[in-house]
Amino acid sequence: MATKTFSLPFLLIVCIFSQLSSTFGDPSVKDLGQHAGYFSLPRSKSARLFHFFFQSRNNSSDPVVIWLSGGPGCSSSNQRYISYLKISNLIYVDQPIRTGFSYANDSTDLRHDEDSVSNDLYDFLQAFFKEHPNLAKDDFYITGESYAGHYIPALASRVHNGNEKKEGIVINLKVTDISLVTATATWSAG
């Protein structure tokens, strides 16, 4: 009696297609509002900050959370924790400039300190909330991990000062959080 064997490539294809069909059939995935893109920075010659935005799965009036990764120089785009989307609108920003998909063609646009990075992020937030005015009234939280612990307080201070001086759109800053461990351990994936 002959034995039937399957090749490894065949098994891989079967696994991939089984994952695709379950992903495409999941309404929580296909209904997920998201977009990505670049915002120009007014204090730069050619810098563009890349962002990835996901709408809350629950309610569009949920808080807005910006996630900043550590590094410095680690892309925020690789930290996609689905549990955040159950309770918030989530923004990932590749920062500082020349991190991830963010770029600049002029070396004078590179930032080397928290104040400059926080100015860029503040300008990014002004552009983001101008494009999404319905989110500007929602509570706003800054969170991240690792080296982002340097950027988070600087950005919170910058947002607070910008609000006090009425420099632009008022950002409804509430609380900041710096994870001492990775967010996988901090938030449940369920």
From Swiss-Prot:
Pfam families: Peptidase_S10 (PF00450). GO terms for molecular function: serine-type carboxypeptidase activity. It is found in: Secreted. Glycans are attached at residues 58-59, 105. Its main location: secreted. Coiled coil: none annotated. PANTHER family: SERINE CARBOXYPEPTIDASE-LIKE 48 (PTHR11802:SF259), SERINE PROTEASE FAMILY S10 SERINE CARBOXYPEPTIDASE (PTHR11802). Belongs to the peptidase S10 family. This is Putative serine carboxypeptidase-like 54. The gene is SCPL54.
